[in-house]
């Protein structure tokens, strides 16, 4: 590894057009998990693959589902409008109350279902993966949440501004925003910030870039460690000069287009599959969560300072095809021992992952912005993959 280098990651807010779509797609997944038990449907049987497009005063939702008939289009529309309202869109070109919502959901393909569903108890067929693919998890001890510093702080900047906006403290700022942070590394450790970019929608049309900077700079400074911002740090706040038209009215959004923002900011490989809108039979989502969980627990256990972990699956096949670990020269034990240890410590079949991480719940809308990783586990089971409760078992296994 190079001793001195710069690395950059970006984040986007919940009002970014693609994130609006991620939120809507995950609200649909949560709706099916909430309503299923009320209708007597086993949560294990719920299926959802939901894609969303949002543009000027228009939302289109399409995909495949399996769940309670009680989930009607009217109910879905109500959930979607509530989500858009919560994000904060009440502008002429995209308003939660007046935008047109088109819903094009249909039953899951029987061909897919037969490869994924387990047979009845007592048979020998396990629940298979919902698709083929590769998934990566990553952890590093360079931040308290064991996330890479650039994406960690890019998220933190926007979350602080969002909290201020929702509280009413920053009423002139709109929902749509982006951040980007260039971190200086010395001896492989983050030590400062070279460049800061924040582009933030404003609701007063004639606001200047300097006026927007006056609003956002305190939150940037609050987000970053003391001493990281110096007189050499270069600021780019609304560098185009104006950001009044925002959200899906300014730029069409789609589900699943911010997969690097959702994960590690480019500091680790990505298998290519998006998360939002997918129930946990889709290993794009659940196995990526399991990969992060295992990598984080390896680092939390002190078995490595950095860890990249890959899982691979085939559709209809329960067991992972391969497990690969790279500790980037920081491991305290060999990678092959760690690969054996994680396989022993956790059932990595799709059903095993869903059970271990308790994923058959309405816990997904909250993941749709500010990253799926580096978050605090919730009491109701949200962000369960961020727990470090496997660390002791891994230490014993090696």
From Swiss-Prot:
K(+) binds at residue 51. Its EC number is 2.5.1.6. Keywords: ATP-binding, Cytoplasm, Magnesium, Metal-binding, Nucleotide-binding, One-carbon metabolism, Potassium, Transferase. It is an enzyme of class 2 (transferase). Pathway: Amino-acid biosynthesis; S-adenosyl-L-methionine biosynthesis; S-adenosyl-L-methionine from L-methionine: step 1/1. Mg(2+) binds at residue 18. This is S-adenosylmethionine synthase. It comes from Rhodopseudomonas palustris (strain HaA2). The gene is metK.
């Amino acid at each position: 590894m190079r001793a001195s280098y710069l690395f950059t990651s970006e984040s986007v807010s919940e009002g970014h057009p693609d994130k609006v779509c991620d939120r809507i797609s995950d609200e649909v997944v949560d709706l099916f998990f909430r309503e299923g038990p009320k209708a007597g449907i086993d949560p294990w049987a719920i299926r959802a693959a939901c894609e969303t497009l949002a543009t000027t005063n228009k939302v289109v939702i399409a995909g495949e589902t399996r769940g309670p008939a009680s989930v009607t289009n009217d109910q879905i529309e109500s959930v979607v409008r509530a989500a858009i309202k919560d994000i904060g869109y009440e502008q002429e070109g995209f308003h939660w109350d007046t935008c047109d919502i088109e819903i094009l959901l249909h039953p899951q393909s029987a061909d897919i279902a037969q490869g994924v569903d387990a047979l009845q108890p007592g048979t020998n067929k396990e629940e298979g993966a919902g698709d083929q693919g590769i998934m990566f998890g990553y952890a590093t001890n360079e931040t308290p949440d064991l996330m890479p510093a650039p994406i960690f702080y890019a998220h933190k900047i926007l979350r602080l501004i969002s909290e201020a906006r929702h509280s009413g403290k920053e009423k002139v700022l709109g929902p749509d925003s982006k951040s980007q942070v260039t971190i200086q590394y010395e001896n492989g450790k983050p030590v400062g910030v070279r460049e800061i970019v924040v582009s933030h929608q404003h609701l007063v049309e004639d606001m200047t870039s300097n006026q927007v900077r006056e609003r956002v700079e305190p939150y940037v400074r609050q987000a970053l460690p003391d001493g990281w911002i110096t007189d050499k740090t270069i600021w780019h706040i609304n560098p185009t000069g104006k950001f009044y038209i925002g959200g899906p009215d300014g730029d069409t959004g789609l589900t699943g287009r911010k997969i690097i923002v959702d994960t590690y900011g480019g500091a680790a490989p990505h298998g290519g599959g998006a998360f939002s809108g997918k129930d946990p039979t889709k290993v794009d989502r659940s196995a990526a969560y399991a990969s992060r969980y295992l990598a984080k627990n390896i680092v939390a256990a002190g078995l490595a300072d950095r860890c990249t972990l890959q899982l691979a699956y085939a559709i209809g096949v329960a067991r992972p095809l391969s497990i690969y670990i790279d500790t980037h020269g920081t491991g305290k034990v060999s990678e092959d021992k760690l690969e054996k240890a994680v396989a022993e410590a956790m059932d990595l079949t799709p059903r095993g992952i869903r059970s271990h991480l308790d994923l058959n719940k309405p816990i997904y809308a909250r993941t749709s912005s500010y990253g799926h990783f580096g978050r605090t586990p919730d009491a109701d089971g949200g962000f369960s993959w961020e727990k470090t409760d496997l660390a002791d078992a891994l230490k014993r296994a090696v």
